[in-house]
């Protein structure tokens, strides 16, 4: 079975520098321990941090969203990672290149870089083609080394290059953060990709679960939400694993995940109605004016930030003094 999850951050972040996910991994924790993985399954996830020994940042900011390769050596990695997202360039070109080299040296497949936009593998007797790109602007460089903001014609050409595959998957970093339904342009692009030959479209970036639709008999999951990520806001804790089983009468299915206080995922059976993906599916083609859509985006962002500030205050005693000063200084600069 193919198992697909959403956003994965192996590192410490902004509000937990020195005691976040990365620090737990350094101490020997495995973030995937709750996924009940089988050797016969093929796992895919979005690598939304940097794995390198180098950074073009300084002080505290050189360690946020970055972890050293040696610290990941004890983790049983997923089989394939997407490396096209808005955090992989956070520490510069050399860091991104080092991360790709680390994955290759450890025989871990990756997709979404400019030189490796797609991959083809065999699973359950089928040839699977998968491609990845990002539809989000990059905040750290004007020339990202991953496949960024492609034109429709370029997307079509890459899909057509997978024509000999039995099954084609698109893994897309897109949309707006912290909202539970897609923007209308995403729906348009998703339909276009299905018409070009994609059999399954998987989205991520909003950091919360969004709905799905079936278009021309093909599944489109607009956002899987987080898999491993240091976010305390409750809507960012619910996620799914998408299952693709060519030996089952039900080709595509899903299971729910919950992100615990250690920011690691575990399977759950029951989920609040507001996060139920069948409910969220009813919102996919929600007709709403641009102004109202983005008003909801910014309202949710304010709620997310409020939770972060409260958590920051609660954890002041966990910060190293120099990290605390750097974070406060950066916060004041941004204001």
Language model segments and positions:
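Binuclear metal-dependent hydrolase catalytic cores centered on His/Asp/Glu-rich metal-binding motifs
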Residues: 13-34, 65-66, 123-171, 188, ...
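Active-site-proximal segments of metal-dependent phosphoesterases and phosphodiesterases across multiple
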Residues: 53-74, 166-197
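Acidic/His-rich segments in extracytoplasmic proteins that coordinate ligands and/or metal ions
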Residues: 59-109
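Conserved beta-sheet core of the metallophosphoesterase superfamily
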Residues: 78-80, 184-241
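A short C-terminal boundary segment appended to hydrolase-like catalytic domains
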Residues: 241-335
